[in-house]
Amino acid sequence: MISLFCSLLFSQSIVTQESYDSRFTPPEIGLPENMPYVKSLIWGKEGAFRKLNIGPETRIEELKLRRKMLQAHQWLGIITLAGLAYQYDVGKKLYDGDDSDYWESHYDKHKAMGYFTYMTYMSTASMSFFSPPARKYDNNMSSIKFHRRMAALHFTAMMAQPFLAKKAVESGKRYNELMDAHLKAGTVAFFALSLDALGITFFK
């Protein structure tokens, strides 16, 4: 009798567990339609990560990983924006001013912050770029589409900044011209990233 009771109890626990699993475990989710081209090169059916067997084994696990990566993307973006605000403010004062004391005390800080923000920016971008695809994509205008368009703008400006600064130092004759372009690239990067942050926060 005890053995029968234990068997019934055990079988009931299995049924209960199966019922729980079927109710609370979502069915497998396929790859989304209209996946962005670059994302499909990485995560598509014939994407690089599929061929190299990189990443989670199921789409559900992929979506969990995507959420974690995008959360890191957001926090790194905030850090980058704060760093860019400081760098832009100091850089503009260095460019506009003629105070040698300010230059001597802040030039190295501006340069160091430039390396820091470039590193955090690229880390931020990589979190989004290499994250698994979303559950779905649509053609309607949204905060995500606005984010992608602004990202193309501030990414280009961030790539141009160090190149222009390096060329300005190397080319004495075009120093003022290249430094002016460097400042403009920094302005575009800072304000585009600021608008991007506002858009992703308030635009639905």
Name every feature range the model reports, one short phrase each.
Residues 1-2:
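Bacterial N-terminal signal peptides that target proteins for export
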Residues 100-109, 141, 173-181:
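Extracellular loop and loop/strand-boundary signature of outer-membrane beta-barrel proteins
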Residues 66-95, 109-132, 145-169, 179-203:
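Hydrophobic alpha-helical membrane-anchor/signal-helix detector
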Residues 5-108, 123-138, 204:
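N-terminal targeting leaders of membrane proteins
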